[in-house]
């Protein structure tokens, strides 16, 4: 039986935070390294705040969760859902990578694939939720969609610019 991410994160975190790993990666010994979060957190948010459960609500909002937030700070997703709910919105959690690391690293073919997959997921969500605004928690992920996706996918540039995409702090 293979080891799933459910158990793997428990093994990876001590290795990520070890002095040897920091030295190999060129990280200062006193600097902290964020660990991977338990995957059960994200499953709970995805199940509790699905696009389907928000369908038909006038005040539905798509909460786009990028790969960094998903892996390192899923509790932030719960807090954001609480804030949106307190403001009278119905959050719909959509988890999909931004491709920011691939874009920054110059891996354009991979970046394009990630952008296509993420845009398709967001487009399907906005159709289901009658053009609900898209909020992101990680500014660099949102800026990737706004600035870079149009360059990577010229045919989608009009759709991207017509959407209400912002970070939660805007």
Task: Label each PLM-derived region with a short phrase.
Residues 1-170:
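Iron-sulfur cluster-binding electron-transfer modules in prokaryotic oxidoreductases
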């Amino acid at each position: 039986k293979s080891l799933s991410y459910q158990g793997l994160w428990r093994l990876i975190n001590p290795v990520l935070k070890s002095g040897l790993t920091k030295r190999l990666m060129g990280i200062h010994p006193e600097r902290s390294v964020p660990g991977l979060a338990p995957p059960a957190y994200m499953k709970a948010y995805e199940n509790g705040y699905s696009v389907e459960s928000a369908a038909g609500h006038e005040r539905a909002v798509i909460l786009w969760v990028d790969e960094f937030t998903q892996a390192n700070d899923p509790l932030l997703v719960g807090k954001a859902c609480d804030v949106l709910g307190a403001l009278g919105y119905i959050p719909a959690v959509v988890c999909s990578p931004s491709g920011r690391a691939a874009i920054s690293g110059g891996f354009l073919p991979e970046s394009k694939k990630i952008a296509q997959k993420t845009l398709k997921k967001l487009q399907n969500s906005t159709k289901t939720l009658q053009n609900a605004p898209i909020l992101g928690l990680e500014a660099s992920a949102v800026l990737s969609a706004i600035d870079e996706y149009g360059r990577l996918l010229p045919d989608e540039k009009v759709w991207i610019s017509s959407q209400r995409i912002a970070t939660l702090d805007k």
